[in-house]
Amino acid sequence: MMLSRAAVRSIAGARVAAHAASPLLSQRTLPAVWTRSMAKDNKPPKFSKPESTPAQKATPKAPEPAESEKAEQKQQQQQQQQTPAESEPEPEIDLSKLPDLRGGIPTTLEYEMAQKEAGKKPVAGEEAETQAEGAEGPEAATSGSGGGGRKKGQLPDSAYVSSTEKRRQKMANWAFIAAGLALVGGTIYLGREWDEEELEKHHDIPNGWGLGLWWKRAKARMTGTVSYYQEPAFEKLLPDPDPSFERPYTLCISLEDMLVHSEWTRDHGWRLAKRPGVDYFLRYLSQYYEIVLFTSVPFANAEPIVRKMDPYRFIMWPLFREATKYKDGEIVKDLSYLNRDLSKVIIIDTDPKHVRAQPENAIVLPKWKGDPKDTELVSLVPFLEFIHTMNFPDVRKVLKSFEGQHIPTEFARREAIARAEHNKLVAAKAKKAGLGSLGARFGIKPSKLNPMAMEGEEDPSEAFAKGKMIQDIARERGMRNYLAMEEEIKKNGEMWLKMEQEAQEKAQKEMMKNMQSSVFGWFGGAPSGEQQSGESEKKA
C-alpha cells in the first residue's frame, strides 16, 4: 500500500517538473501599461524569467529526457534569457496638436477627398490592411463589420454625404424651382395689357401681344413700383397760387445748417441754435416772396422746430423729407414738382447735391456752424429785394450772372458802380419843369400825380433828383412795412397765438368726436354727427 502511494507521488512530481520545464507552458510577466511603441516595433516584448515557487522547489526533479530534447530545451531557455536591445525612447506627444473632441469626433471626409484628388498613396499600415482584406475574400470586403467596412475609393463621393445634407440640397433645389416659376409668372402678369388709366401715362408703349411689347410693359410696371418709393409723395407739392395772396416769386429755403444748427455734446446732449437774423429774413422777404421751407429732414423731426422757429406762419408752405426725390443714393429737391413757374423760383441751400436737378435756380451758401456773429443770411436780403423790385422775367439769367461769385459782395460792388453813374447823370442833367411844377401852380402835390407813389411816400421824381435810385425807394417802402408788421406782432402777437391754439384744440375735438360717432355708428349705438348737431340746434 505504501509502495503504491510513493509511486503515485513520484509520477505527479515528474509531471509538475515537465510542465515547469516546458517553454510553451511557462508563465510570462506582461507589462502593466500598453504603449504606442509596442505597435510600432516589430520586436517581441521583453519578458522576465519566471521565479520558482516554494512548491516547485520542494518538488523533486523529474528524470532528465533524452539528449536531443535537452539540447532543444536549453537553446530555447537561452533565447528567452537573452535580453533584447532596449527599445528606442518613446517620443513625447504634443497635446496642443490633438483635435478638440468636445464638439464631437471630427469628420475625415475632407482628408479622404484631398487624398483622392492628390492621388496620394496609402501608408504602409493601410496598404497592409487592404491586402489583408483582399486575402480574406469578397465576403469580408462587403461586410460592414469586423474590418471597418469599405475602404476609401470603394464608394462614390455621394456616399459620404449625410442624410441631413441631402435633405437640405433637395429643399434648396425645390426652392430654386419655385423662385424660377414665380419669376416667370410675375413677368407674365406684369406684362399684361394696360387699362385706360395706365394707357394715358404710357403712350409710348401700346397694347399688343408681341413679346417685345410684353417685356416693355412688364419693365415699365416694375420701374413704377420702385419709383413709388423714390419719387415725392405728390405730383404737385403745392396747390395752385391764390390770386388774393399771390406773390410774383417763390423762395425755397432749407432748414438744417441754414436757419438752425443742431449739435450734440457729452455735457448738454442735443442742442439747437437759431441763426442770427432769421426773424428779419423771413418777415422782411415775406412781403415779396412766397416762402417755402424745403428741407430734407423728416416731418416728425422738423415740424416741431418749424412751429417753434416761426410761430406766426411767415413760411407759407413747409415741405419735408417726404417731398424730396431719392436718386442715385442721394436726396434731391426737384423743383419741377412745386407746381410753380421755374423762371420765378429761387432755392437757397447748403448742399449742392440737393439742388443738382435745377442748379440754375439755386444759391448755395456755406453751412452755418453756430457762429453768433454770422451775417451771411441777412446780407442776401438786398439782392433778393432787388430781384423783386426790378421784376425780372427770368431769375435764372440773373443768378447766372453771379455764378461762381459771392453774391452779397458782388451785388454791393455792382450797386456802387450803378450809384456813381446815377449821381453823374443827375448832376449833369438840368432840372426840367414838368408836371410837378405845373401841378404846383394849382396847389397839387406831385405825389398825387404819380401812380407809383403811395400814401406817405416821397415822389419818385423828387427822390431821383436827390440822388436816390429805384432800389432805395423800394427799400424804404419795405422797411416801413416791416416795422409796421413788427408793431402789430408786439400788440397782437400773443392774441394771435392764443387764437391759433384754440382753433387747433377745437379741430382736435371735432376730429375725435367724428371718429367716435363713426365707430359707434357701425354698431348702431350713437347718432351721427349731423344728427347731434341738429339736436343741439333744436335745443338752442
Swiss-Prot record:
Topology with respect to the bilayer: Single-pass membrane protein
The region called Disordered is annotated at: 35-164, 519-540
Q: Which GO terms describe its cellular component?
A: TIM23 mitochondrial import inner membrane translocase complex
Stretches of Basic and acidic residues bias are at: 113-124
Example of a GO biological process term: protein import into mitochondrial matrix
Q: What is its main location?
A: mitochondrion
Mitochondrial intermembrane face residues: 192-540
What does the UniProt entry say about where the protein is found? Mitochondrion inner membrane
Q: Which residues cross the membrane?
A: 172-191
Mitochondrial matrix compartment segments: 39-171
Any idea where the FCP1 homology domain is? 244-387
Keyword list, A-Z = Membrane, Mitochondrion, Mitochondrion inner membrane, Protein transport, Transit peptide, Translocation, Transmembrane, Transmembrane helix, Transport
Q: Where is the transit peptide?
A: 1-38
User: Residue ranges under compositional bias (Low complexity)?
Assistant: 52-61, 74-86, 131-143
* Subunit structure and binding partners: Component of the TIM23 complex, at least composed of tim23, tim17, tim50 and tim21. Interacts with preproteins in transit.
Q: Which family does it belong to?
A: Belongs to the TIM50 family.
- Functional note: Essential component of the TIM23 complex, a complex that mediates the translocation of transit peptide-containing proteins across the mitochondrial inner membrane. Required to direct preproteins in transit and direct them to the channel protein tim23, and possibly facilitates transfer of the translocating proteins from the TOM complex to the TIM23 complex.
Tell me the protein's name.
Answer: Mitochondrial import inner membrane translocase subunit tim50
Q: What is the lineage of its organism?
A: Eukaryota, Fungi, Dikarya, Ascomycota, Pezizomycotina
- Gene name, please? tim50
